[in-house]
Amino acid sequence: MSEKKINLLDLDRKAMRALFADMGEKPFRADQLMKWLYHFGVSDFEEMTNINKVLRQKLAARCEIVAPEISSFQKSTDGTIKFAINVGQGQEVETVYIPEDDRATLCVSSQVGCALECTFCSTGQQGFNRNLTVSEIVGQIWRVSHFLGFAKDTGERPITNVVMMGMGEPLLNLANVIPAMDIMLDDFGFSLSKRRVTLSTSGVVPALDKLGDAIDVALAVSIHAPNDELRDILVPINKKYPLDEFLAGIRRYIAKSNANRGRVTVEYVMLDHINDSTDQAHELAKLMKDTPCKVNLIPFNPYPGSPYGRSSNSRIDRFSKVLMEYGFTVIVRKTRGDDIDAACGQLAGDIRDRTKRLAKKRMQENQISVTMN
């Protein structure tokens, strides 16, 4: 039986250099290869013309370059594109490209499904299957970059920002998310600014501390309720890591981070007559007063079977004005791609194994999988 080949898209620069050292090669050769992968999108060793033939042959014998394939895509009337990405075993995740006048953001998934079961989120209602590998995470960017033309002009704006806000809770997959983000930030990788890579979390506090020790990226935090009683219902992980613990973890992260410029983004989905009253706005403002942040109000995007409705514009406006009276910067997120179910909270994918009992068992046994090993 032949030895399984190493997928080079699984390796950040440190791991890539270690592989090349094992082959008796100098570190700069690893850097050259990464540029071919991430600057030019080359997947054929024979096209890497500044790498000598002997090394190309060694690489072909020992390594491979395999990214998950785009199985289908839908384009919204607003230019948003939702991609179904085939990650094997009959499973798909969803990746969303969001173009704007001055940027283009790619919303990337970190897991097949999600174990957190947030009650307003379509993905959370589908159950959890597995973590994505490094190559499956960076492969989403790699494939969409190919779709957009990499160095060629296809009329689509190239990716300038990446947000880890797709399917899954990124902090439950640190072992793969951290090296994937390293590749996003690396000058020999996708070469993105740390302020242009954002990780969103619902509050796995021990993993948030580990993230802050390992890498510096922009942070978005899913709060969605002004008190523990309501958040226990909307975001069940709150029962394990309540708001006071989460906010303390956020402040620790801010203290370590340059990418956040001293404050994080608070995400707050607007659910009609659930969490959107002016009293709750006052409560949220008092909750967040010691945590430097701007607030992103997200109109709820309904999905089939959802028990919630979207807050009216007038309720969102009143809620926003209360927060601004306390001095918060408030942004009401423009809904993008809702006509193709690509908006926030609508990603579900094709998850064949939706056994929630398995997810809950893993959460109990692994303390929600916060180790990086």
Swiss-Prot record:
GO cellular component, one term: cytoplasm
The protein's required cofactors: [4Fe-4S] cluster
Record keyword Transmembrane present: no
Annotated [4Fe-4S] cluster binding sites: C114, C118, C121
Parts forming coiled coils: none
Molecular-function GO term, any one: rRNA (adenine(2503)-C2-)-methyltransferase activity
Active site: E94 (proton acceptor), C344 (s-methylcysteine intermediate)
InterPro entries: Aldolase_TIM (IPR013785), Methyltransferase_A (IPR040072), RlmN_N (IPR048641), RNA_MTrfase_RlmN (IPR027492), rRNA_lsu_MTrfase_RlmN/Cfr (IPR004383), rSAM (IPR007197)
GO biological process, one term: tRNA methylation
Catalytic activity: adenosine(2503) in 23S rRNA + 2 reduced [2Fe-2S]-[ferredoxin] + 2 S-adenosyl-L-methionine = 2-methyladenosine(2503) in 23S rRNA + 5'-deoxyadenosine + L-methionine + 2 oxidized [2Fe-2S]-[ferredoxin] + S-adenosyl-L-homocysteine; adenosine(37) in tRNA + 2 reduced [2Fe-2S]-[ferredoxin] + 2 S-adenosyl-L-methionine = 2-methyladenosine(37) in tRNA + 5'-deoxyadenosine + L-methionine + 2 oxidized [2Fe-2S]-[ferredoxin] + S-adenosyl-L-homocysteine
Entry binding sites for S-adenosyl-L-methionine: G168, E169, S200, S222, I223, H224, N301
Chain ranges of the Radical SAM core domain: 100-339
Annotated disulfide bonds: C107-C344
UniProt keywords, alphabetically: 4Fe-4S, Cytoplasm, Disulfide bond, Iron, Iron-sulfur, Metal-binding, Methyltransferase, rRNA processing, S-adenosyl-L-methionine, Transferase, tRNA processing
Lineage: superkingdom: Bacteria
Protein location: Cytoplasm
E.C. code: 2.1.1.192
Keyword Isomerase assigned: no
SUPFAM superfamilies, alphabetized: Radical SAM enzymes
Biological function: Specifically methylates position 2 of adenine 2503 in 23S rRNA and position 2 of adenine 37 in tRNAs. m2A2503 modification seems to play a crucial role in the proofreading step occurring at the peptidyl transferase center and thus would serve to optimize ribosomal fidelity.
Entry similarity comment: Belongs to the radical SAM superfamily. RlmN family.
Note: Reaction proceeds by a ping-pong mechanism involving intermediate methylation of a conserved cysteine residue.
Protein name: Dual-specificity RNA methyltransferase RlmN
Lineage: Bacteria, Pseudomonadati, Pseudomonadota, Gammaproteobacteria, Alteromonadales
